[in-house]
Swiss-Prot record:
Domain of life from the UniProt record: Eukaryota
Organism for this UniProt entry: Ipomoea purpurea (Common morning glory)
Catalytic reaction equation(s): a plastoquinone + NADH + (n+1) H(+)(in) = a plastoquinol + NAD(+) + n H(+)(out); a plastoquinone + NADPH + (n+1) H(+)(in) = a plastoquinol + NADP(+) + n H(+)(out)
The keyword NADP is annotated on this UniProt entry: yes
Protein's gene: ndhJ
EC number per UniProt: 7.1.1.-
Protein name: NAD(P)H-quinone oxidoreductase subunit J, chloroplastic
GO molecular function terms noted in the UniProt entry: NADH dehydrogenase (ubiquinone) activity; quinone binding
Keywords linked to the UniProt accession: Chloroplast, Membrane, NAD, NADP, Plastid, Plastoquinone, Quinone, Thylakoid, Translocase, Transport
Oligomeric form and interacting partners: NDH is composed of at least 16 different subunits, 5 of which are encoded in the nucleus.
Amino acid sequence: MQSFLSVWLVKHGIIHRSLGFDYQGIETLQIKPEDWHSVAVILYVYGYNYLRSQCAYDVAPGGLLASVYHLTRIEYGVTRIEYGAYQPEEVCIKVFASRKNSRIPSVFWIWKSADFQERESYDMLGISYDNHPRLKRILMPESWIGWPLRKDYVAPHFYEIQDAH
């Protein structure tokens, strides 16, 4: 089973892999890092005008890192009713990157709401988002060593308390 979007992407020669559907019927697609920027532009033009959320996680110790995007297609002035309520079209995109070369194109210039979310993913997991205008730590001090949410992260035994002036 494929969603309308997945069929449309295949029809237009856009390589992706379906990872299935969640409990709400939202399809998850895997996109290669080198294809992500062009696919993101296509999705925006297709009508996915709202980045609901972006997050990242460490798949396994020593394994891949994943950047996850939840996109919504909101059509203003158009009402699609399912089960008595408006149902916008949604898709989940997963972009996997290797731990040694964890670079993924930023979608900041497509969806401005990716700004802080991509920065948090960088800060916690070390995923570098190419062409992000302000890619720097957002939660941890700039002097922090390592990426705290990686499964192979070794927590330091001592934390220096810094004065907030």
